[in-house]
Regions:
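C-terminal motif of bacterial Sec signal peptides marking the signal peptidase cleavage site
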Residues: 15-17
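The canonical Cys-X-X-Cys-His
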Residues: 122-133
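Residue-centric detector for conserved, function-critical "anchor" positions
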Residues: 12
Length: 134
């Protein structure tokens, strides 16, 4: 390994280490004190699942992850309203929570189409909220 490669690797590692990762269970989410913390939890748990949008079928591990995501996003969506930026923000938080509930139902039924749709709609809701309030 050359010195240049070593420094590049260390630099990339340092950048990756600076990105907040919060993998909190629902009972800990309710204790968060900043909207940024809530958003970090959502990104940490949702982004890996969003990559599965459109897949024709899912494995048992995916269904478990979708169930977990659905329950935790319902909590983060409710918690986000504690830091409300107005009625439109609250509406989007409620919408996200509703889509998370749909994801949980799809996971219970092991309905691939409904799960993919719920994930797509959750991601779209996140993007809409970020475009208006971030």
């Amino acid at each position: 390994m050359t010195l240049k490669t070593l420094f590049l690797s260390l630099g990339l590692f340092a950048i990756a280490a600076c990105v907040p990762k919060r993998d909190l269970p629902p009972d800990q989410i309710s204790k968060l004190t900043k909207l940024d913390e809530v958003m970090d939890v959502q990104a940490t748990i949702a982004d890996p699942q969003f990559k599965k949008i459109g897949e024709a079928s899912y494995a048992d591990a995916d269904w478990a992850a979708f169930t977990d995501l659905g329950s935790r996003i319902q909590v983060t969506a409710a918690k986000a309203k504690d830091f409300s930026k107005g009625p439109e923000f609250d509406k989007l938080a409620d919408q996200l929570g509703g889509k998370a509930k749909e994801l949980s139902a799809a996971a219970t039924a092991k309905d691939s189409g409904a799960a993919s749709t719920a994930l797509t709609e959750m991601k779209a809701t996140c993007k809409e909220c970020h475009s208006k309030f971030k």
